[in-house]
């Protein structure tokens, strides 16, 4: 490839129709309020849509066979484990919320059927509760929300998954449930993976070992950046995302994130949400959260 004949095109990471929000919580059995909050929030969405005459008119004009419900709303909930998919989707259905599980443990036929019904907004398939196995190559325009049930392993992964919302250009919510318990759990897992990887790489030696070390260091730094993004309560989420990806002069979103909507109220919500957790961030702030190898 001749560099003199190539051109680079760089698009902005900013999508102003996405509303980013971090929900602070505890994932201990006593303090975990994620499910009750989620059900209440979803029920409010269903009620608003069902009682909106304009929405009913819009749906009737789109479909002549009355197969699409006025209150239907498409969403994705990302969870870390297959068991979480099954349990959470079952609990949502018990609360009369159409949800289906999608993970690698299902057969190809089951996954395809689930995906097709969700894309078609079939009854009972408003929401897909999925692991990260879901989403690649799927383009459903009217996804109104993406929820991360726990902290993802990387900033890039979070941004890509959240970006599956609102592809039709209309407003969509990107919610991330954040707890310091999750942060520490994922951090320990990454630290362990780094240790194991370094051990294998040292055995190989040479350039392979150096490349692996760089890769794992980048992985740790990406996760640290995402945890910092969640902890921040003093800046626009869109600005923080843009700066992570190297954009300059990203403007504040004007009410398309929790900071720009809530201001000082976000700090209080963080204090209240994380009050039951023990603050153990000193290691992270000293940048040795993942061990001495990346000091």
Predicted regions and their residues:
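Helicase motor core with emphasis on the C-terminal RecA-like subdomain
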Residues: 1-200, 210, 249-250
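C-terminal accessory region of SF2 helicases/translocases
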Residues: 142-143, 147, 151-160, 165-295
